[in-house]
Swiss-Prot record:
Catalyses which reaction(s): alpha-D-glucosamine 1-phosphate + acetyl-CoA = N-acetyl-alpha-D-glucosamine 1-phosphate + CoA + H(+); N-acetyl-alpha-D-glucosamine 1-phosphate + UTP + H(+) = UDP-N-acetyl-alpha-D-glucosamine + diphosphate
GO terms for cellular component: cytoplasm; membrane
Needed co-factor(s): Mg(2+)
Annotated region described as Pyrophosphorylase, given as residue ranges: 1-230
Enzyme class at the top of the EC tree: transferase
Protein name: Bifunctional protein GlmU
Family annotation (HAMAP family): GlmU (MF_01631)
Residues the entry annotates as binding Mg(2+): D105, N228
Role of this protein: Catalyzes the last two sequential reactions in the de novo biosynthetic pathway for UDP-N-acetylglucosamine (UDP-GlcNAc). The C-terminal domain catalyzes the transfer of acetyl group from acetyl coenzyme A to glucosamine-1-phosphate (GlcN-1-P) to produce N-acetylglucosamine-1-phosphate (GlcNAc-1-P), which is converted into UDP-GlcNAc by the transfer of uridine 5-monophosphate (from uridine 5-triphosphate), a reaction catalyzed by the N-terminal domain.
Signal peptide location: none
Length: 452
């Protein structure tokens, strides 16, 4: 890469078809706002200068873009895509390199595809346009090429002849050119059209009028899927999940029922991991080799170390860390807690704000009582400790190495190493009580029945 690169991300659309109080480009695909996808793509393709163009109706976009480290430019009023790109000119620090126009509502374009667009410029094209061939070209603008395969013009559907409408190669909107040339051409774009707008696509015709070469780079249709509605959002999510499932399996992950497993944008899973059906991964998950995630589990912000097991019906929340060979079983929730090597939490348990030592065993129904209504408090369970079923651990509290808690104990004080904690009412027996109770109840029922 010999020339510097910049990226202009168009994010000023109103997105009314989403029917949402949330701005369209802040809706998420795979747990990540679409704007974040675009900014990450710009960075991945080597853009050192990124400008996000936002609209006056959506200051939340400006705030989000600035939080992501991009410059911002306001398009007000909105007068088309060409006008939006022009709005970014003052915010760009350097016009000496190449610039690419990306869209914040097109989240699935890969860095490899964008690299091919820049390669077209490096190969001698003055303008490079990203096109695709959808199953149904519908009303997309057609990319008309010449005999050499270069782009001759972009024809909007409403202006296309029958022969041009038969062309299957259409415009994605993504366009790259040397920045200085791009803005020079945009300065010549007029708005003599039904909408009175300035169209970025006119740049191609203006470049050809100067006898400059324009190239087409073809992408898969799934990559350039634009999101304008909830249905489009669902389609983008499905496309991402399909891509991720194939990638995971190609990298050595077993998915028993791939179509039922859902990943986040940043899920990291090592080889020889087995994922059973109906598992959902939120952001921030790292899974090491030989882990098994059983069916119907939900995992977010968690780290599962080598050989750990989770589920079925496990919920691992942010900050959960499962040590090597540890086990979290059915109907167990772990939050902001660390399980050391070989620890077992097999069923019906909540562990929050805690550390569980190596080879400790947590019995069914155990609860760490970590919240007093104002603050969270920590529970520490030592190595080889045994927590009896139905134990309540009232934090802050420590159970020492090798200590036991008796079933049903409410632990409110630290338990020394190798001690037994027992805190429950002594069991007493009342001889004959059950017979007397049953006789009284039956007599009462008989009297009531006789009165009806």
């Amino acid at each position: 890469m010999s020339r510097s690169r910049s990226a202009i991300i168009l994010a000023a659309g109103q997105g009314t078809r989403m029917k949402s109080k949330t701005v369209k480009v802040l809706h998420k695909v795979a747990g990540r706002p679409m704007l974040d996808w675009a900014v990450a793509l710009a960075g991945d393709c080597g853009a050192s200068d990124i400008v996000t163009v936002w609209g006056a109706h959506s200051p939340a976009v400006r705030d989000a873009a600035e939080a992501l480290g991009t410059r911002t430019a306001l398009q007000d009023p909105p007068k088309g895509t060409g006008h939006a790109v022009l709005a970014a000119r003052a915010a760009l620090a350097d016009l000496s390199g190449d610039a690419i126009v990306l869209y914040a509502d097109t989240p699935l374009i890969t860095a490899a595809t964008v690299a091919r667009v820049f390669e077209a410029l490096e190969g001698g094209a003055s303008v490079a346009v990203l096109g695709f061939e959808p199953d149904d070209p519908a009303a997309y603008g057609r990319l008309i090429t010449n005999e050499a395969g270069d782009l001759d013009r972009i024809v909007e559907f409403k202006d296309a002849s029958e022969a041009e409408r038969a062309v299957g190669l259409v415009n994605s909107g993504v366009l790259a050119a040397p920045a200085e040339l791009l803005f020079d051409l945009l300065g010549e774009v007029g708005n003599d059209n039904a909408n009175g707008e300035y169209y970025l696509t006119d740049v191609v015709g203006l470049a050809r009028a100067r006898d400059l070469r324009a190239a087409v780079v073809v992408a898969d249709a799934d990559e350039v899927l634009g999101v304008n509605s909830r249905a489009d959002l669902a389609e983008a999510e499905a496309a991402f999940q399909s891509r991720m499932r194939q990638s995971m399996m190609a990298d050595g992950v077993t998915l028993i029922a791939p179509e039922t497993v859902f990943f986040a944008h940043d899920t990291q899973i090592a080889r020889d991991v087995v994922i059973e059906p109906n598992v959902v991964f939120g952001p921030g998950v790292v899974i090491e080799e030989d882990v098994v995630v059983h069916a119907h589990s939900h995992i977010a912000g968690a780290h599962l170390k080598r050989g750990a097991h989770a589920g079925p019906f496990a919920r691992l929340r942010p900050g959960a860390e499962l040590g090597e060979g540890s086990k979290v079983g059915n109907f167990v929730e772990i939050k902001k807690s660390q399980l050391a090597e070989g620890a077992k939490v097999s069923h019906l348990t909540y562990i929050g704000d805690a550390s569980v030592g190596a080879n400790a065993n947590i019995g069914a129904g155990t609860i760490t009582c970590n919240y007093d209504g104002y603050d969270k408090h920590r529970t520490v369970i030592g190595d080889n400790a045994f927590i009896g079923s139905n134990t309540c651990l009232v934090a802050p509290v420590t159970v020492g190495d090798g200590a036991f808690t008796a079933t049903g104990t409410i632990v409110t004080q630290d338990v020394p190493a190798d001690a037994l904690a027992l805190a429950r009412t002594p069991q007493t027996h009342k001889p004959g009580w059950a017979a007397r109770f049953n006789a009284a109840k039956q007599a009462r029922k008989a009297r009531k029945d006789s009165q009806t």
